[in-house]
Amino acid sequence: MEHCTFNLPDVQASKPSIAINLTRVGVTNVKKLVEIKRKDKRPIVLISTFDVFVDLPSDRKGANLSRNFEAVDEVLEKILSMPVYEIEQLCSDIAHNLLGRHEYANQAEVRMTSEYMIRRASPATGIKCQEVVNIFAEASAVRGQGNDDYFDVKKLIGAEVVGMTACPCAQEIMRDKAANELSELGVDKDTIIKFLERVPMATHNQRGRGIISIKVAHDFDVSLESIISIIDHSMSSSVYEVLKRADEKVVVETAHMNPKFVEDCVRTMADNVVKEFPNLPDNAVITIKQTNEESIHRHNAYAERVALMGDLRSEINHC
């Protein structure tokens, strides 16, 4: 009996009924185990989530999504044979690989999120604990006009860190009340001033969430550890998973001796980004966000700054 053979049509390559181009087509929530090597330290193993996209021209019905998985897997396999030190470079390599596989696409994007464990000690007793920091990276590759073999690659690295803030406004109200009460009790003015300088007044607190992301060209590297440190030190105090009573005293006192509005946190981060990264190019894109979860209000407080590094550097240097 003679068997008939059929050539299966490439449905994705057929023309769509509505011929418009699409900005992003791809896959989201792809889970992968990623090992990042470190100099003179043990590697970091991350359980990471990837979103992978390419653009789609108007004359094509669909994208070959299996190629997205192949691109991610191929680049991750290379980690076994060569050291990878930055998650943003990993995203950059995947984006570059995507454009090579999707010949019809002009742009590829990769996003990666993960939880990064850091070890730290409590401020007074030195109890060791592990803290979780949310980290993320992105990369985009754009095919060069007139040269399909040239890809313009940009990459982004960032982190979100949780801390604590103390409200300056409410603290001034309580400071004024304390001064009046002490005066009525017969305490002289100089003693009141000395007391208020040594003992911080009560105020309401917020759990703050600071975010910094830095976008650069493919040939620049940005320290993730520096980003995390900048965010952590921009708020009134760090927070810790485990605290003894002596530690609680230090955290509360530190926060109330360093009260900050949500705007102060963003400005502090901006100032420290300029100081910490003097070699960043002027066209690097800096995004800084701070959300303070209010304790006495139903709303949250928010502030943000997006700027080119050159503009930020110029503003701060002229303050």
From Swiss-Prot:
<comment type="pathway">
    <text>Cofactor biosynthesis; 5,6,7,8-tetrahydromethanopterin biosynthesis.</text>
</comment>
<dbReference type="GO" id="GO:0005506">
    <property type="term" value="F:iron ion binding"/>
</dbReference>
<keyword id="KW-0479">Metal-binding</keyword>
<dbReference type="GO" id="GO:0003934">
    <property type="term" value="F:GTP cyclohydrolase I activity"/>
</dbReference>
<protein>
    <recommendedName>
        <fullName>GTP cyclohydrolase MptA</fullName>
        <ecNumber>3.5.4.39</ecNumber>
    </recommendedName>
</protein>
<dbReference type="GO" id="GO:0044682">
    <property type="term" value="F:GTP cyclohydrolase IV activity"/>
</dbReference>
<comment type="subunit">
    <text>Homodimer.</text>
</comment>
<feature type="site" description="May be catalytically important">
    <location>
        <position position="167"/>
    </location>
</feature>
<comment type="similarity">
    <text>Belongs to the GTP cyclohydrolase IV family.</text>
</comment>
<keyword id="KW-0408">Iron</keyword>
<dbReference type="InterPro" id="IPR003801">
    <property type="entry name" value="GTP_cyclohydrolase_FolE2/MptA"/>
</dbReference>
<dbReference type="GO" id="GO:2001118">
    <property type="term" value="P:tetrahydromethanopterin biosynthetic process"/>
</dbReference>
<dbReference type="Pfam" id="PF02649">
    <property type="entry name" value="GCHY-1"/>
</dbReference>
<keyword id="KW-0378">Hydrolase</keyword>
<comment type="function">
    <text>Converts GTP to 7,8-dihydro-D-neopterin 2',3'-cyclic phosphate, the first intermediate in the biosynthesis of coenzyme methanopterin.</text>
</comment>
<dbReference type="InterPro" id="IPR022840">
    <property type="entry name" value="GTP_cyclohydrolase_MptA"/>
</dbReference>
